[in-house]
A protein has these predicted regions:
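The canonical Cys-X-X-Cys-His
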Residues: 74-85, 120, 124
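Aromatic sugar-binding surface patches on proteins
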Residues: 129-136, 254, 321-323, 518-524, ...
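Sequence/structural segment immediately N-terminal to covalent heme-attachment motifs in c-type
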Residues: 65-80, 98
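Bacterial N-terminal signal peptides
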Residues: 1-10
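Acidic, Ser/Thr/Pro-rich low-complexity intrinsically disordered segments
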Residues: 15-29, 38-57, 61-62, 194-284, ...
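Low-complexity "stalk/linker" and mucin-like segments enriched in Ser/Thr/Pro/Ala/Gly
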Residues: 54-64, 130, 468, 505-519, ...
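C-terminal capping alpha-helices of c-type cytochrome domains
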Residues: 107-130
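Ser/Thr/Pro-rich low-complexity tracts
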Residues: 13-64, 129-197, 273-284, 288-375, ...
Length: 703
């Protein structure tokens, strides 16, 4: 969490392009849809980037610019106001911003004069109008169904990601209305809605048939976690006279779902509303309606890298439906999402053969065993062979299954030598070339078509996990930016962890970062050459380590950090993206190019020089990242025209001895000098941190 707090601090200053919401959030394969994006700092957007294949888009030219005449007044008056200080994290209409300012004055006695209030409202409304960007998105007829990430890029840089769903159902757009004039739809379909006004309600009229099991599945929170601050959707199912038959306001956390069996032929109406009657341009939803499955898993839930996956979807309301799917697995091993016509499912992808049923001969290890417990008490047994040391890892909850798989390995003599249960892992030595028995069962003897599992038995290796944040990095030509890399050493990892970037665009480079064995956070520096051309491109961050069992290599999971109720939160993304845009307004450097020498009881001043250029005269916020755990340096603001600040590296009360007694043979701890304006975060590079020559003398004085 410390890393989240640190990164959130820098994000609060850097006003990078941000997509808070867009409408609609999806389209049918083979169609083109106009999408409205709302957010902050989106003016000048000219590129649309989508993950995967089959989804392309063009940003429409135009869009208003922010009138920043009264931005300094807003910063002065609203910098400490929770409701008004972070417009980049919210999407509200111009009228809603005006009402919020007046409410803060009226209810909280905010010290804002009527004249200043008008100016602040003018700035916020200008930002709201400029946050509107329109793009046309084309979905190819053969585009795989599922969830895609969309980003845009502006002269300021690359934006945060927003989710976009490709479906194979007819799509409609919901509008504000009344019960008596409910919108006629034909099931199955997907409805796209947005509540921009307070008190807005959407009504959908359909024909139901006796005995038909219909599902109404609304997606909002699952597409945008920040929506919980302003959108709590509610579903109500009504008969033709308006009598309530079913209601739900939260099945997938805040996303409602109704599973209903129609009692008789007739007309029925589904009502969609907000629990508190609120409206917001970011209150956007997609609503799947019809005879559709949910809580689904893919059977078998495992595939070999790059191979075709021929299986079927199981879950609730799948009886009588044709749910066969045939998709291709990605080339990267690990847990991944695969899109199907019935929703996205989690699948484990492995480089080893996948076995889906017991075979008459022994299975040569390594291998993956995948299937489902179709009936209560069902047990599967496999004969396996292959001497060596192996990891046994089980997957059930992680693939969306209600099962708790238990894997028991029996020796040639029938005695139990290893077992794992649930989403767990264990190591075992198979010393004999004789056959062993793998027994798979559901831990509580339950069963059903959706009780899927997979168990991988692979050569033992060190286990390493890694995340990288932020997921979107913007560079200026000739400058650098830092990416925080957090590692978790699970099993058998020893020594340094090397972190590097792969697939960077031409003109962008990075040096390998080393995370010593006594640290779990490092900073990867990306640098754009002085002549780097404008570009927006995904890339990968990879961490590598060694252990007694060999080498571990893992791709870092990209994370976007955002604020919810002023607390930093992280959401996983599928790609890291780097952009080269704009020009340098400033640089920063240490006045003394020497190691930072820390002391356990007193502060160490660190002078930082600010070099301004191209007429830039705004605020620059300066900080040090990656200090040893017993020291901290408060960030400093270099106001307009200021060209030097001093950071105080001081003890924070934690035990300094682990660092003071640190083995000199370990790789040094590197601090990162970072500085940012409203538009850009700049990293100076790594600076070694060492103990001062007289550091331990201060501790002697305590005695």
């Amino acid at each position: 969490m410390a890393g989240l707090q640190l990164m959130a601090s820098s994000l609060a200053w850097a006003q990078a392009p941000r997509i808070n919401a867009f409408f609609p959030m999806g389209a049918r394969a083979g169609t083109t849809v106009e999408v409205e994006m709302r957010g902050a700092n989106l003016e000048g957007a000219d590129v649309l980037l989508a993950t995967g294949s089959g989804v392309t888009g063009v940003v429409e030219p135009g869009g208003a610019k922010v009138d920043e005449r009264y931005k300094p007044l807003w910063q002065q008056k609203c910098g400490s106001c929770h409701e008004l200080r972070s417009p980049a994290n919210r999407s509200m209409t111009a009228a809603q911003w005006a009402a919020t300012v007046q409410r803060m004055i009226r209810q909280n006695n905010a010290p804002i004069s009527p004249e200043d209030a008008d100016k602040i409202i003018q700035y916020l409304q200008s930002a709201a109008r400029a946050g509107k960007v329109v793009a046309k998105i084309t979905v190819a007829p053969d585009a795989p169904p599922g969830i895609y990430e969309l980003r845009t890029a502006t002269p300021r840089g690359v934006s945060t990601a927003a989710l976009f769903e490709v479906s194979q159902l007819p799509e409609v757009v919901g509008v504000n209305g009344k019960l008596a004039s409910a919108q006629r739809i034909t099931l199955p379909c997907v409805a796209n809605g947005c509540f921009t006004a307070n008190g807005e309600r959407h009504y959908y009229r359909f024909t139901g048939h006796a005995g038909e099991r219909l599902v109404f599945n609304l997606k909002a929170f699952r597409f945008n976690e920040t929506g919980q601050m302003f959108f709590n959707p509610v579903l109500r199912l009504l008969d033709a006279d308006g009598n309530e038959l079913a209601e739900n306001h939260g099945y997938y956390e805040l996303d409602p779902l109704i599973d209903w069996q129609c009692p008789k032929d007739g007309e029925y109406i589904l009502e969609v509303s907000d629990l508190l009657g609120r409206g917001n341009p970011a209150s956007v939803y997609r609503l799947d309606m019809g005879r559709l499955p949910y809580d689904t898993v893919l059977v078998p839930p495992a595939a070999r890298t790059g191979a075709r996956v021929a299986g079927y979807v199981e879950g609730k309301n799948t009886v009588g439906l044709r749910t066969a799917v045939d998709v291709r697995a990605p080339n990267d091993a690990g847990l991944t999402q695969l899109g199907t016509p019935f929703g996205t499912t989690q699948v484990y992808v492995s480089p080893y053969p996948v076995v889906t049923r017991p075979l008459p001969k022994a299975v040569q290890l390594p291998a993956v065993f995948a299937g489902h417990f179709a009936a209560a008490g069902e047990v599967s047994a496999y004969t396996v062979i292959g001497p060596g040391r192996y990891d046994i890892e089980a997957f059930s909850g992680r693939i969306g299954s209600p099962a708790v798989v238990r894997a028991i390995l029996l020796g040639p003599d029938g005695n139990r030598i290893a077992a794992v249960e649930g989403d767990a892992r264990a190591s075992v030595e198979l010393a004999s070339s004789r056959p062993y028995t793998l027994r798979l069962e559901e831990a509580s003897k339950r069963g059903g078509p959706e009780f899927a599992y997979c168990v991988e038995i692979r050569p033992a290796r060190p286990v390493l996990e890694c995340v990288a944040r932020p997921d979107a990095i913007t560079l200026r030509p000739g400058l650098s930016a830092a990416v925080e890399v957090v590692v978790t050493r699970r099993e058998g990892v020893r020594g340094d962890i090397e972190v590097s970037a792969e697939g960077l665009p031409a003109g962008v480079s990075s040096a390998k970062t080393v995370i010593p064995p006594d640290q779990n956070v490092g900073w990867l520096i990306l640098t754009a050459g002085p002549d780097a051309a404008p570009v927006v491109q995904p890339f990968r961050i990879v961490a590598r380590a060694r252990g007694q069992a060999g080498e571990a290599s893992v791709r870092a999971v990209p994370q976007e950090v955002y604020r919810l109720n002023n607390e930093p939160r992280a959401v996983n993304r599928s790609q890291c993206v780097v952009a080269v845009r704009g020009r340098a307004d400033f640089t920063a450097e240490l006045a003394e190019h020497a190691p930072i020498l820390v002391k356990p009881r007193s502060a160490t001043p660190v002078r930082v020089l600010i070099h301004r250029m191209n007429g830039f005269n705004g605020n620059v916020v300066v900080r040090l990242l990656g200090l040893p755990s017993a020291w901290v340096a408060n960030e400093e603001v270099a106001g307009p025209g200021v060209q030097e600040v001093t950071l105080q590296v001081r003890p924070n009360g934690a035990d300094p001895m682990p660092f003071l007694k640190r083995d000199a043979a370990l790789s040094p701890i590197m601090a990162i000098l970072e500085a940012n304006s409203d538009d850009f975060r700049f990293a100076f590079g790594g600076v070694p941190v060492q103990k001062a020559p007289n550091a331990e003398d201060e501790l002697k004085e305590d005695r």
